[in-house]
């Protein structure tokens, strides 16, 4: 029996989501379109298999084939990131980070991470996160120019003396200097942990410097710029750290790994290792630069005055409307983005004075410079006349026509 016959409600809602993804433009920087091959194996019989433990050391029988699958995923991950050890079991980036903390430090130890309101992540010590509840947290941020001042980070680190420094961000448009972070960590005897969830796809293509050999441990998601399945990974070059990480993930945080997702990670890594991937990642950055240049030419303020990676962060501190207003206006025109706090923020985190835009998903659909220029100008048109709902509807129809030339999925399920 087909899903349509068995559960038409879920079938119909899934197909409505397919329509939304195909007809609209996805510009949330953390979202992307994965491969049909990834989705195919995620929907396979591998979902049936319990495999607590690690390859060769399972608590259940019948794991000979999933052992081979996980081993293949590990080998591809190590080759991709040029590292010695990899754990591919984390179910998410947040759980990967939780595993890193559990492996390297103890409850009550101090961590230094990027302030959430400056572009950091919940799991980098935010008070509402378990990382801010289990551990004492302190923060560095960006200056008013939107860039990290590494001397300021050094001053904070020397004063606070954290056991672990987290580098990485969810809304930072510039290159992260991992070497400088390692210098600071070494000066105070701290571990350096790099969370590259947002930039991993660029890192493996040589479009952003690698955190290795500087970071003691590196984590990432596998979906954002890597275009794999939703999940997390942890990498290191230190065997002792690797053992602690493995124990922290299982049995510390998780039970049975999701073998259908681990297989999908392996498929995604195969794509990431291809020459085609390097072309894609380069285009992601090129498209982001087109987006940034058009918006600045149209007199919009960008945090840090541009971008080095896959995203731009618009600031509306000089405008009467908020990030939430911009988010809603673009949404009405079929462009999905997200409101975001900015340096010097004057509004609440639920309103914000910024907007985060990313190019990975549009690039996955085949958008290049020409299309990005069109989209960028439409964004500027909408924001220049933010209350004009007729304009928003007209642009929505134009973008729907544009999107129809770049259909990425012919069906909702594989």
Curated annotation (Swiss-Prot):
SUPFAM superfamilies: PLP-dependent transferases (SSF53383). Its EC number is 2.1.2.1. It is an enzyme of class 2 (transferase). Pathway: One-carbon metabolism; tetrahydrofolate interconversion; Amino-acid biosynthesis; glycine biosynthesis; glycine from L-serine: step 1/1. It is found in: Cytoplasm. One of its GO terms (molecular function) is pyridoxal phosphate binding. Its main location: cytoplasm. InterPro entries: PyrdxlP-dep_Trfase (IPR015424), PyrdxlP-dep_Trfase_major (IPR015421), PyrdxlP-dep_Trfase_small (IPR015422), Ser_HO-MeTrfase (IPR001085), Ser_HO-MeTrfase-like (IPR049943), Ser_HO-MeTrfase_PLP_BS (IPR019798), SHMT-like_dom (IPR039429). The record marks 223 as: Plays an important role in substrate specificity. Homodimer. Belongs to the SHMT family. This is Serine hydroxymethyltransferase. It comes from Campylobacter jejuni subsp. jejuni serotype O:23/36 (strain 81-176). The lineage of its organism: Bacteria, Pseudomonadati, Campylobacterota, Epsilonproteobacteria, Campylobacterales.
